């Protein structure tokens, strides 16, 4: 019988409820890893039935946790509202406890003829508004409606029993909470109205006049101010420029101001090209012992289009002739052709004739 490795045993249903969502997902990954191993599942006696059951339970538990989490996220703003309401109710309860402590004072006021709980509420509200310094319109309307309903009632209602002081104090505290909320809303409204009142629309003519006046004021202020130091330095440098220092060069005579002035005067006068060439040559002779080679060709000249085309054609023709000669020479070298003088009779025939002539001369001498 094969046993599951440690950490991969199927969990008991009671344990799943106590686990967190991250732990449940980790357990689900382990079960999936076991289910992928088919050889291991085939070796089990129940063929992995327990693993499948635990896998399904884990999936159901994860789905339930996600559903609870989603509902809690949806109900989060509602819970915040409920907390705020609970705080307000707690404040009201504290106020009722304080009011119950002051019951004897309220009872003495209720014994006075012609006085009712509504009058007490009105007096307390007016004192509160005087202390805050900001009465609200809605609160006044509510108090007027209450007074109207009380006065409109039958005379027998005045003879009835006066309501207890605890109910009056509770109503008073609830009304105070509502009045505080109305005060905050009215303060926001007043702030918005103040911001709107600060916005002003001006004409273009008035704006231009304001701009001109501001420019005049700035001009007067700038006229009275002193120029900055760097502006004065720049103006002085523009009036009295500093002579530029020439860089040191080898094989060059030191620069002199008189020579430069005389050179400027000479340059102003017209000089021919031959005179300039002669001066340049003299200058080279003064500064160096080297001599330029004589020119073998004429200097460059400006030619017309027709002359340039004719020269290009002539050059192309010479180039082709030279290429043909080189090609013929290379071909002859490959074929091993040698140009020699041709003698059809050969050297032997010539020698024979020369010998025969000698014999003839010898025979003639004998005779």
From Swiss-Prot:
Matching Pfam families: GCOM2
Sequence ranges of Polar residues compositional bias: 117-131, 176-185, 205-225
Q: Identify residues that carry Phosphoserine.
A: 269
Q: Does the keyword Coiled coil apply?
A: yes
Q: Which GO terms describe its biological process?
A: intracellular signal transduction; maintenance of ER location; transcription elongation by RNA polymerase II
GO CC term (a single one): nuclear envelope
Is Transcription a UniProt keyword of this protein? yes
Keyword tags: Coiled coil, DNA-directed RNA polymerase, Nucleus, Phosphoprotein, Transcription
Looking at the record, which segments are called Interaction with Pol II? 226-297, 314-339
Q: Which GO terms describe its molecular function?
A: transcription elongation factor activity
Region described as Disordered: spans on this chain? 117-185, 203-225, 254-281, 335-367
What segments bear the compositional bias annotation Acidic residues?
Answer: 357-367
Q: What is its main location?
A: nucleus
Q: Which residues form a coiled coil?
A: 15-40, 300-329
So what family is this one in?
Belongs to the GRINL1 family.
Relate the protein's function as given in its record: Appears to be a stable component of the Pol II(G) complex form of RNA polymerase II (Pol II). Pol II synthesizes mRNA precursors and many functional non-coding RNAs and is the central component of the basal RNA polymerase II transcription machinery. May play a role in the Mediator complex-dependent regulation of transcription activation. Acts as a negative regulator of transcriptional activation; this repression is relieved by the Mediator complex, which restores Pol II(G) activator-dependent transcription to a level equivalent to that of Pol II.
- Which PANTHER family does this entry report, sorted A to Z? DNA-DIRECTED RNA POLYMERASE II SUBUNIT GRINL1A, GDOWN1
What is the protein name stated in its UniProt record?
DNA-directed RNA polymerase II subunit GRINL1A
Species this protein is from: Pongo abelii (Sumatran orangutan)
């Amino acid at each position: 019988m094969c046993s599951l490795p440690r950490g991969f045993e199927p969990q008991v249903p009671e344990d799943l409820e106590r686990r967190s969502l991250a732990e449940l997902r980790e357990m689900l990954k382990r079960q999936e890893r076991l289910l992928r191993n088919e050889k291991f599942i085939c070796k089990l006696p129940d063929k992995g039935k327990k693993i499948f059951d635990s896998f399904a339970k884990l999936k159901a538990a994860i789905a339930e946790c996600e559903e609870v989490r989603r509902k809690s996220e949806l109900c989060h703003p509602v819970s915040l509202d409920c907390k705020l309401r609970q705080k307000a109710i707690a404040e009201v309860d504290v106020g009722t406890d304080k009011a119950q402590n002051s019951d004897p004072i309220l009872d003495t006021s209720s014994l006075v003829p012609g006085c009712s709980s509504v009058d007490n509420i009105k007096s307390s509200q007016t004192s509160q508004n005087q202390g805050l310094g900001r009465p609200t319109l809605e609160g006044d309307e509510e108090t007027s409606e209450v007074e109207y309903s009380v006065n409109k009632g039958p005379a027998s209602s005045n003879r009835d029993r006066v309501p207890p002081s605890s109910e009056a104090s509770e109503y008073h505290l609830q009304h105070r909470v509502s009045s505080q909320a109305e005060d905050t809303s009215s303060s926001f409204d007043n702030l918005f109205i103040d911001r709107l009142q600060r916005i002003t629309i001006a004409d273009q003519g008035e704006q231009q006049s304001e701009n001109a006046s501001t420019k005049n004021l700035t001009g007067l202020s700038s006229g009275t101010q002193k120029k900055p130091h760097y502006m004065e330095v720049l103006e002085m440098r523009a009036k009295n420029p500093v002579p530029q220092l020439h860089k040191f060069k080898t094989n060059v005579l030191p620069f002199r101001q008189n020579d430069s002035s005389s050179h400027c005067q000479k340059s102003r006068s017209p000089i021919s090209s031959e005179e300039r060439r002669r001066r340049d040559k003299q200058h080279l002779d003064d500064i160096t012992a080297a001599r330029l080679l004589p020119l073998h060709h004429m200097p460059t000249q400006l030619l017309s289009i027709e002359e340039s085309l004719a020269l290009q054609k002539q050059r192309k023709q010479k180039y082709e002739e030279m290429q043909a000669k080189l090609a013929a020479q290379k071909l002859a070298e490959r074929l091993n052709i040698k140009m020699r003088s041709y003698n059809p009779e050969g050297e032997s025939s010539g020698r024979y004739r020369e010998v025969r002539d000698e014999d003839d001369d010898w025979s003639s001498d004998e005779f």
